[in-house]
A protein has these predicted regions:
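Core segments of cupin and vicinal oxygen chelate
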Residues: 8-66
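Vicinal oxygen chelate
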Residues: 2, 31-34, 60-63, 69-82, ...
Length: 145
């Protein structure tokens, strides 16, 4: 079944924020928190500091009515700067890869591709900015692929 989630980016304090949200909503993480060090190494990628390696790559927490909030740390040391505008993203998980591509193309039109759709270790993923300045993330998980 297709899903919509809210994706939040933090400048290095995602875990602190999500532990707070966990206590507010009285829920548990939907899956174990993934760390930057959990990602397979990419060719040419420099080694990470211990602090960066332990930063949050992905966390997800159910809040109300089955809605998930998800998050990651966008670290300046990795070329990111978290500012109002790139700290919140609408995350779509369509039912098919074809629908994922269709939505990505339609929402990118007149806007820009932040990360083109590509096969990643967790699934088929991409991100765009629509012509109104809204960030959209697309994920078609590997188990559905």
């Amino acid at each position: 079944m297709a899903k919509v989630s809210i994706y939040l980016n933090f400048p290095g304090n995602a875990e602190e924020a999500f532990n707070h949200y966990k206590s507010v909503f009285k829920t548990e993480f939907a899956m174990p928190v993934m760390r930057m060090k959990d990602a397979p190494p990419r060719p040419g990628m420099p080694p990470m500091s211990e602090k960066d390696a332990n930063a949050v790559m992905h966390a997800s927490l159910p809040i109300l009515g089955g809605t998930l909030i998800m998050a990651s740390d966008m670290l300046e040391s990795m070329g990111h700067k978290t500012v109002v505008g790139n700290n919140t993203t609408i995350s779509l998980e369509p039912d098919t890869r074809e629908e994922t591509d269709r939505l990505f193309r339609a929402l990118s039109e007149g806007g820009s591709e932040i990360a083109p759709m590509s096969d990643e270790f967790w699934g088929y993923w991409g991100c765009c900015l629509d012509r109104f300045g809204i960030r959209w993330m697309f994920n078609f998980p590997k188990e559905m692929n």
